Each structure stands twice: as structure tokens, then as C-alpha cells.
Amino acid sequence: MLRTMLQGKLHRVKVTQADLHYEGSCAIDQDFMDAAGILENEAIDIYNVDNGERFSTYAICAERGSGIISVNGAAARRAAVGDRLIICSYVQIPDSDARSHKPNIAYFEGDNEMKRIAKAVPVQVA
């Protein structure tokens, strides 16, 4: 049996561009993609923290070091410049490997400043 597990996550990145007329996708600073292990053309899910929208698209590379998060095409109607997003990719792995699997998680603050990288989501406490 295969399980679908979180592979990579960009937590609370800020949208820098939203271009309705650009070919669909989400352009992501290459440094951010590397930190989360997200590949060019990989399917991603986007969760908009500010308006609750959830949608799927694919990742394309933005210039390394640019801080760009650009939501393009029809998805530009679901995110505005300044919105905070969570961007995730997933992987299917055998059940036997699922419990030892560690995702790549990059945390952001301010104007897309990467603050830390982790291999697990913290345990939620009461």
C-alpha cells in the first residue's frame, strides 16, 4: 500500500505578484524550492491563510534570491499581493516507510525571509 505524505512545505510565504494573464502556475524563488525539495513542474497545493482559498497548480522557477512568489493564471483570482500562503508538495511512499518519512519544511516571516528549516511539524499543544 502507498501512503500520500507531506514532502515539502513553504510555511507563510507572502505573495509578491499575481498575474491573471501569465500562463498558469506558481513561480517560486529557486532557493525556496530547494529548501522544501519542490521541483520545477511539480504539482503543488496552495492554502491561502488570509482568505481560506485552497487550490492546486504546479511550481515553476523564479529567479534565485529574488523572494518571488507569483500566483499566475486563473489562480491569481485566489490570491492577492501580500497574502500569506502555505505551499505544499506530497509524495507517495510505501506504508513500510511512512512512519520514518521526514518532510522538508521552510518557515518564513516578513517579506519572504526564510527563518528556519525543519524536518517535522511541531506537536500541537493545548
Swiss-Prot record:
Cofactor note: Binds 1 pyruvoyl group covalently per subunit.
Post-translational modification: Is synthesized initially as an inactive proenzyme, which is activated by self-cleavage at a specific serine bond to produce a beta-subunit with a hydroxyl group at its C-terminus and an alpha-subunit with a pyruvoyl group at its N-terminus.
Catalytic activity, reaction form: L-aspartate + H(+) = beta-alanine + CO2
Residues of the active site: S25 (schiff-base intermediate with substrate), Y58 (proton donor)
Superkingdom classification of source: Bacteria
Keywords, ordered alphabetically: Autocatalytic cleavage, Cytoplasm, Decarboxylase, Lyase, Pantothenate biosynthesis, Pyruvate, Schiff base, Zymogen
Keyword Glycoprotein recorded: no
Ranges in coiled-coil conformation: none
Gene Ontology terms for molecular function: aspartate 1-decarboxylase activity
Pathway, per record: Cofactor biosynthesis; (R)-pantothenate biosynthesis; beta-alanine from L-aspartate: step 1/1
Gene Ontology BP terms: alanine biosynthetic process; pantothenate biosynthetic process
Entry cofactors: pyruvate
E.C. code: 4.1.1.11
Binding positions for substrate per the UniProt entry: T57, G73, A74, A75
Location relative to the cell: Cytoplasm
Residues annotated with Pyruvic acid (Ser) modification: S25
Record's keyword annotation contains Lyase: yes
CC annotations in GO: cytosol
Main location: cytoplasm
A Pfam family: Asp_decarbox
Subunit structure: Heterooctamer of four alpha and four beta subunits.
Record-stated family: Belongs to the PanD family.
Cited function: Catalyzes the pyruvoyl-dependent decarboxylation of aspartate to produce beta-alanine.
Protein name per Swiss-Prot or TrEMBL: Aspartate 1-decarboxylase
Gene: panD
